[in-house]
């Protein structure tokens, strides 16, 4: 959709376009393996001079099949969402599939662990999976105001690791310095990188983000 707007394939498209993909998974000893895409829904912000019928026809032909369930969508962004705070934190991260601490990212600088610790948690989880220590991992970090080190570290691998949670936590402690200032330095969070987080979420879609590049672990 974004490419079609930029290259003129669908010139009436506007930036605030949302997609929802429903996927069927199977459980495989704690890991989840995608089987098929069940439904794809596209809600596209558009110019005023295109009808819903024309919009549906063009997107069906040029993009995908199941689109625009709510009809017209001319006004988008914060103007269309009164009370919008810090962007939508679930769709920005794991879409309800993983856990979220509840703090928004956008609008906060990198010194806030709502943002920096969420990024390093992603980095840790990807590094564990990349190292073959698990096929699936949830990493939970707990911080307190004025305390540099996390109060607790928890890992759930859903039965996909041959190591205990305590053993994995020890590996994490030996490979990652989780003080906020160090997180900022190691992930280059003080650089002008945040423009790209304003679209398509913070996790998974843009592999150039530092937290998407697994660290080589020593264990």
Predicted segments, located by residue:
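Glycine-rich, mobile lid/loop segments that gate access to catalytic sites or pores
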Residues: 1-76, 204-208, 212-216
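Structural signal for hydrophobic packing residues in well-ordered secondary-structure cores
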Residues: 1-9, 59-66, 128, 132, ...
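Solvent-exposed alpha-helices and their adjacent loops that cap or buttress functional pockets
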Residues: 11-15, 32-35, 82-85, 131, ...
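Short beta-strand elements
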Residues: 19-46, 79-98, 141, 153-160
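Intrinsically disordered, low-complexity acidic/polar segments
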Residues: 30, 51, 74, 100, ...
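Hydrophobic transmembrane alpha-helix bundles
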Residues: 45-62, 95-109, 166-190, 216-219
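Glycine-rich anion/phosphate-binding loop at the beta-strand->alpha-helix junction
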Residues: 50-129
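Internal helix-turn-beta structural module
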Residues: 134-136, 142-219
